[in-house]
């Protein structure tokens, strides 16, 4: 298994993203969001795509966001096989090596929610320290609304989990809008 720079390969990234979101039972972001992000930020050094492959087949990838001395582990995706084989660990290890070599001072593992046990386990294996992110609302508290792991979304998540991938792609286009 190898890890390589993916440049602006939004198509490879998006296929992995679709597989991950389906496994999690979540709608994907629109493809144009990632295409725009990669095409705008990678050439400026403000983002980087890393892809783990085995025999030429992509197994996992991450999009890193760079700002000054900070790196944010912004988005991660994998195939089920990549998850079993630790491809996400290889990508994260490569990202950490790159951050250190680039003189970055902070590596932010990104946001999560208390109910995202698998994600929290993955991050804790890498000695990540969880810190609360302040949120502000006007009116009623929306903490439970913003957590996609909340039991209130269980039925909806099952629907996304069993949706054929072409329909999942369309659902992402319909449910999340990015100009």
At which residue positions do the language-model features occur?
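A conserved beta-strand-loop-helix scaffold within acyl/acetyltransferase catalytic domains
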Residues: 1-84
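Short amphipathic alpha-helical coupling segments at ligand-binding clamshell hinges
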Residues: 13, 87-91, 104
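Conserved acetyl-CoA-binding loop-helix of GNAT-fold acetyltransferases
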Residues: 83-97
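Active-site/acyl-donor-binding loops of N-acyltransferases
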Residues: 104-105, 109-179
């Amino acid at each position: 298994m190898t890890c390589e720079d993916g440049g602006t390969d939004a198509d490879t990234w998006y296929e992995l993203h679709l597989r991950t979101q389906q496994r999690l039972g979540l709608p994907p972001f629109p493809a144009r969001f990632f295409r725009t992000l990669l095409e705008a930020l990678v050439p400026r050094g403000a983002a980087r795509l890393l892809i783990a492959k085995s025999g030429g087949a992509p197994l996992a990838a991450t999009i890193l966001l760079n700002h000054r001395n900070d790196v944010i582990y912004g988005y991660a995706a994998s195939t089920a096989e990549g998850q079993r084989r630790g491809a996400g660990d290889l990508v994260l290890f490569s990202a950490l090596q790159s951050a250190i070599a680039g003189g970055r001072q902070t590596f932010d593992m990104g946001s999560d929610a208390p109910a995202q046990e698998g994600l929290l386990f993955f991050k804790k294996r890498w000695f990540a320290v969880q810190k609360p992110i302040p949120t502000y609302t006007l009116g009623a508290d929306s903490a439970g609304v913003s957590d996609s792991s909340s039991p209130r979304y269980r039925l909806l998540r099952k629907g996304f989990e069993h949706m054929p991938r072409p329909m999942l792609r369309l659902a992402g286009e319909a449910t999340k809008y990015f100009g």
